[in-house]
């Protein structure tokens, strides 16, 4: 049976992995004392600054997350940019 699991790959229990990720998120949030309100304000501040340099950012779609890396914790900001066809220049 282990041969078949190795051949086809056995998926990890998704609920256990989800619980692990949630626990890590809680621990990281607790370590840095960042409340949801502070994260929302950080997201708004990032959007404001980035719009000065990149007017095509989609501020509503910005995602800011804290995660645990191998050597250190990470603050990650995903900032979607509208393509030129999606956002015509102002004239």
UniProtKB/Swiss-Prot annotation:
Cell cycle as a keyword? yes
| Keywords carried by this UniProt record | Cell cycle, Cell division
Superkingdom to which the source organism belongs: Bacteria
* One Pfam family here: MinE
Its GO CC terms are:
plasma membrane
Q: Specify whether Cell division is a keyword of the entry.
A: yes
Q: Name one GO biological process term.
A: regulation of division septum assembly
Q: Which family does it belong to?
A: Belongs to the MinE family.
Function description:
Prevents the cell division inhibition by proteins MinC and MinD at internal division sites while permitting inhibition at polar sites. This ensures cell division at the proper site by restricting the formation of a division septum at the midpoint of the long axis of the cell.
Q: What is this protein called?
A: Cell division topological specificity factor
